[in-house]
Design a protein with these regions (language model features):
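Nucleotidyltransferase catalytic core that binds NTPs
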Residues: 1-148
């Protein structure tokens, strides 16, 4: 059985997310998705609209996904590959040549897939007028901060 692993925040789930998951699953038999926790997003300076548990449940409902695990920090990738017996790590092409994934090539294959043209969480936020940088950090309203 060929096992595939990918990482992401997967907030504001959209067609581009579904496509990378579909294409990743086509490369193997079992797809593990590591989704960034709320705490890890804070470390990265990112704010997700949906909390970790909601994003995890949405990913678990997608037919291409076999297992969802938390991504707690940058340094867990090597351990994830070994623990889940991963054959291939798949990421979007925007991560190509990034040391965080290149260092895994001694223990597994690393594949970079082209992003789906014209769709991204950032673009959705911009199109909706929800992306408002604060001190250089992307912010969007949440149900608790919206004025009705």
């Amino acid at each position: 059985m060929k096992r595939i692993l990918t990482y992401g925040t997967f907030d504001l789930l959209h067609f581009g997310h579904i496509e990378i998951l579909r294409r990743a699953k086509e490369l193997g038999d079992y797809l593990v998705v590591a989704v960034s926790t709320d705490e890890f997003n804070a470390i990265k300076g990112k704010k997700a609209y949906h909390n970790f548990n909601t994003r995890k449940k949405m990913l678990e409902a997608i037919r291409y996904v076999d297992l969802v695990i938390p991504e707690n920090d940058w340094n867990q990738k090597r351990n994830d590959v070994l623990e889940y017996k991963i054959d291939t790590v798949v990421m979007g092409s925007d991560w190509e040549n990034n040391e965080k994934f290149e260092v895994l090539k001694d223990i597994c294959e690393v594949v970079y897939l082209p992003r789906t043209e014209g769709v991204s969480t950032t673009k959705i936020k911009q199109d909706l007028g929800l992306q408002q940088p604060v001190n250089g950090v992307e912010q969007i309203p949440t149900p608790n901060t919206m004025n009705n």
